[in-house]
Amino acid sequence: MSSEFSLPHRGVVPELSLSAEMPQDAEALVVPVFQGEDGLDLPESEFFDGVTVRAALDMLGATGAAEEVTKVPASTGPIVAVGVGKRDDMDAEKLRRAAGVAARSLTGLKVVATTLGELGLAAAVEGIALGAYTYRGLKTADVPEDQQPVQKVVFLGKDQALFDAAVITAEAVAFARDLVNAPSSHLFPESYAAIATSAAEDNDLTVEV
């Protein structure tokens, strides 16, 4: 049986990269914020002025509640604060969900940096990638530029091995979504076998069908 088969349409996820420094072309910075007992709890970071950002968030009424998104205007591009809830209650799934919400708020932007990975790099990568996942299928109408999903997200950090593993996980989930979203008229038992064989060969694995 031939392993040559391609899905009629593929979903899109942003380009993901890791950097120890703020990229010069970043149009926005996404940061996490906790819901503190006495107001906002903003994690410290070397990549922004916490005092200034905290004051702006307070002025805008941000609370840090889970999945709340607040955008702070800045001369170098907006700072997008996404709430992750109370610090003691945070776990990987809550961070993943918050990252997904943040990703969906970044439409129209080309390059964005984020410090979300400082709270958990794997969950942040998976949340951003899958939150921004877009599947248009048979739709052919052009999408206005300001409604396009974010094109590239740079995670500020240094753990390349953990980042690479998270990217692989996100890509695998996105591919599974492609299979679910594909029209049933385009998929049949032989095509699933061909897809599995092709994926195995691409990763230097052997497969028997």
Q: Over which residues does each language-model region extend?
A:
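Glycine-/small-residue-enriched capping loops at alpha/beta junctions
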Residues: 1-209
